């Protein structure tokens, strides 16, 4: 009974976590390239 809920939570968190890491890395990359000139 708990497995479907756990699978749903994991499947919902994985894309959000990956998106958050991607956005953070992208912002850091843009900031670094902007400061580097």
From Swiss-Prot:
It is found in: Cellular thylakoid membrane. Its main location: membrane. It comes from the Bacteria. It is a single-pass membrane protein. GO terms for biological process: cytochrome complex assembly; photosynthesis. The chain crosses the membrane at residues 5-25. GO terms for cellular component: cytochrome b6f complex; plasma membrane-derived thylakoid membrane. InterPro entries: Cyt_6/f_cplx_su5 (IPR003683), Cyt_6/f_cplx_su5_sf (IPR036099). The 4 large subunits of the cytochrome b6-f complex are cytochrome b6, subunit IV (17 kDa polypeptide, PetD), cytochrome f and the Rieske protein, while the 4 small subunits are PetG, PetL, PetM and PetN. The complex functions as a dimer. Component of the cytochrome b6-f complex, which mediates electron transfer between photosystem II (PSII) and photosystem I (PSI), cyclic electron flow around PSI, and state transitions. PetG is required for either the stability or assembly of the cytochrome b6-f complex. Belongs to the PetG family. This is Cytochrome b6-f complex subunit 5. It comes from Synechococcus sp. (strain WH7803).
